[in-house]
Amino acid sequence: MDLLRLSRLFSGPRPIGLSVLQHLDLVGSTRWTGGREGPARLRAAFCGSSSPLPLGSGNQKEMSSLCSDSSKLSTVAPQEEAEEESFGSLSGKFSSRRIFHKSTAQLYNLQLKEQGGEEEELEPRPWRGRRNTQYWYFFQCKRLIKEGKLAEALDLFERQMLKEERLQPLECNYTVLIGGCGRVGYLKKAFRLFNDMKKRDLEPSDATYTALFNVCAESPWKDSALQSALKLRQQLQARNFQLNLKTYHALLKVAAKCADLRLCLDVFKEIIQRGHAVTEETFCFLLVGCIQDKKTGFRQAMQVWRQMLSLGIKPSRHGYNLLLEAARDCGLGDPEVASRLLLTSQEETILLPPPKGRHMAGRKVQAKTVHGVSLRHVEALERQLFLEPSQKLEGPPALPEARVTSRTQPEVETTAEPGHTVALTPLASKPTHLELEVSLLSLGTLSPAVVSFGTVATPADRLALMGGLEGFLGKMTEHGLQPDIKTLTLLAEVVEPGSTAESSLLSVLDRHRVEADVTFFNTLIRKKSKLGDLEGAKALLPILAKKGIVPNLRTFCNLAIGCHRPRDGMQLLADMKKSQVSPNIHIYSTLINAALKKLDYTYLISILKDMRQNSVPVNEVVVRQLEFAAEYPPTFDRYKGKNTYLEKIDGFRAYYKQWLKAMPAEEAPHPWQEFQNKPVGDQDTTDKAGGLRDG
C-alpha cells in the first residue's frame, strides 16, 4: 500500500510529490528563484488539492505545516517587493544626513550625455561589414600611403581594424605604417606604433628598424631625432642584433642629416667591420654628410668622391647631383689644405701619417678588407677629411718641385692675402680661366701649370674646379649617365650669372632631350631678378608659354625680387589679379624686402594697403621686416634740423601702428597636424620627438 500511495503522489496533471520535493529543495536553499507565482502554486498544490489522500496522522500534520509555511512565504515575498518598489519610504535611512548636493535637470542631462559619450568611446559599435584579414589591411594601408594619405591609413588601422573588427595586427601592419610616417618625418607617431608593437609581443623585422631610422632622418627636429636614433642603436647593440646593409644606410642617413661627418664615418667603419659590401649608395650618404659642413663641405665632398672612384665604384646621377649641391652650398675651406689634398695624387694622400698620439692605435687596427675597402683606408680618409692647417707640415713632403716652378718657366711672383692663396702662375704667360682646364672629378694628374688654388668664393668658381658646365656634363657622359631636369636645375643655380654658360642651358635641354619644368625656369628668373634684370626675367615668360608650362606662385615671387620701383611692384600685383592668382604672404614679403633696400617708405605703405585690401594674414617674417623698417638709423639725429627722411619714417610709423592692429595674424601650422586625427592641442605637443619605451 505504501508503494501505491507514493505512486499517487507522482501521478495526475500536477504531481504533488514533485511539488513537495521542489518545496523541500527550495526551503533548504537561500534564495527563491521561482518568481511571484511560485509560493502560490506550491500552496495550491498542497492545500487546494481536490483528491484526498489516505495518509496517516503524522503525514497530515506534515502536510498542514507545509501549507502554513507556503502561505507565510506567499505573504512575505509580495510585502518585501512592495517595500522595494515603493517610493518615498527611504527617508528613515537617510534621516541622519546633514549635507545635500544641489542638482538640476540640466546637470543630470549633462551627466547622462557624458556617460553616453564615454560608453561610445569605450565600447565602439560592432563591425557589421565584411570581415577582412590582416593582409587586406596591409595592402590597403600601403595603397593609401603611396597616394599620400597617411592620415586615412592610420585611421583605417586604428579605428576600423583594431576597434571595430578587433583584429590582432601583424608585424607587417605596423611596419608599413612606420614606413609611411618615415616619409613625412612623423617621428612621434612612428615610435608610438613601435612601442605598441612591442606591447603586443610582435618581433620587429629589419624593415621595421630601417623605417624607424628613416623617420629619424626625415624629422623636422634634428636634435631630438638624433637622440632617438642613438638610443635605438644602443638597444640593438645591447641585443647584439645584426643589421643588414639597408638598415645601415638608414642609420647613415640619420648621421648625415642630423649629425656630422664624424658620426657618418663611425657608421661607415661599422659597416665594414660587419662585412657588408660598400656600394655607391653608401658614398652618397657620405656626400650628404659633407654638405652639412658649410665651410669646408665642398673640399670634403671632392675627397669622398675621389676615394669612391679609386675603389672602382661607378658613380650615379644622384651622386653628381650631390656634388652640385655641395658646390652651391659649401665652401672650399683653407686653400692651402685643399691644394695639398686635392692637387696631389691619390697614392700620396692615402698614406698620410696619423696625428700624434695615435701611432700605436693605428698599428692595432686589423686590416679587414671588404670588396677593396679596409679600415686602413677609412682611417686614412678620416685623417684627410679633418686635416687641420696646423698639421699641414707633418704630412708627406711638400709638393713636387715641378709643380712650383718649371725649368722652362721664368721666375714666378707670389702674393698672399689673409684667408686665401692665389695661384702660382708665371706673370708673363698667365693662362685665362677658359684656357686652363681643371677637373677634380677624375683621378688623373692635373696639369703641372696648376700649383695651388686661388680665390674660390662663389658657386661658379667651385663649378670651374669640376670642369665647368661642359666639363661636368662630359664626365657624366664618360660614366654613361645623362642629366635629368634636377641636374640641369642645379647647374642653373651654380653657373655664373649672365655668362654664356647660363644662356646655353636652354640649348643643353634640347640637346639631351630633357623636358623642362616650372622649377627650372623659376631658377633662371630668380637669378636674373637678383641681378636687377627684371626685363630679362620677364622675357622668359613667353618661353614658358611656348613649352606649355603654367607659372606658379613661386614664379611671381621670383619676379618680385627685381621689383625695386613702386610701379613695377604695383604692376606685378595688378597682373596677378588679372591672371586670377591671389598674392600670398611670400610675395608681399619679397616686395617689402625690395622696398626696404631702397628705403622707399611710400612704396612700403602702398604694399601694406594692398595687403590689407586682400586680407592676407601677417606672419612673423613680415613683422620682423616692418619692425626693422620702423626703426630710426643708429646715427640719425632728429634735433639737427628738418629732414625729409624723418617725415617719411614718421609717417610710415604712424600708418604701420594702425595697420598692424587691423591685420589678422597667420598661425604657423604644426608639421604633423595634417596626419593627426585629433587636433594638435588635444595631444601632448611638448614631446616633439616621441621616444622609445624601455624594455
UniProtKB/Swiss-Prot annotation:
Q: Which UniProt keywords apply?
A: Mitochondrion, Repeat, tRNA processing
| The keyword Mitochondrion appears for this protein | yes
One Pfam family of this protein, by short name? PPR_3
Molecular function terms from GO: tRNA binding
Residue span of region Disordered: 391-416, 672-695
Q: Does the keyword DNA damage feature in the UniProt annotation?
A: no
- Which InterPro entries does the entry link to? Pentatricopeptide_rpt (IPR002885), TPR-like_helical_dom_sf (IPR011990)
GO terms in the biological process aspect are:
mitochondrial translation; tRNA 3'-end processing
Provide ranges: composition bias, Basic and acidic residues.
685-695
Q: Which GO terms describe its cellular component?
A: mitochondrial matrix
The primary location reported for this protein is mitochondrion
The places in or outside the cell where this protein is found are: Mitochondrion; Mitochondrion matrix
Q: Where are the PPR repeats?
A: 133-169, 170-204, 205-243, 244-278, 279-315, 316-352, 470-485, 517-551, 552-583, 584-618
Q: What protein family does this chain belong to?
A: Belongs to the PTCD1 family.
Oligomer status and interactors: Associates with mitochondrial leucine tRNAs. Interacts with ELAC2.
Q: What is the documented function of this protein?
A: Mitochondrial protein implicated in negative regulation of leucine tRNA levels, as well as negative regulation of mitochondria-encoded proteins and COX activity. Also affects the 3'-processing of mitochondrial tRNAs.
Provide the protein name. Answer: Pentatricopeptide repeat-containing protein 1, mitochondrial
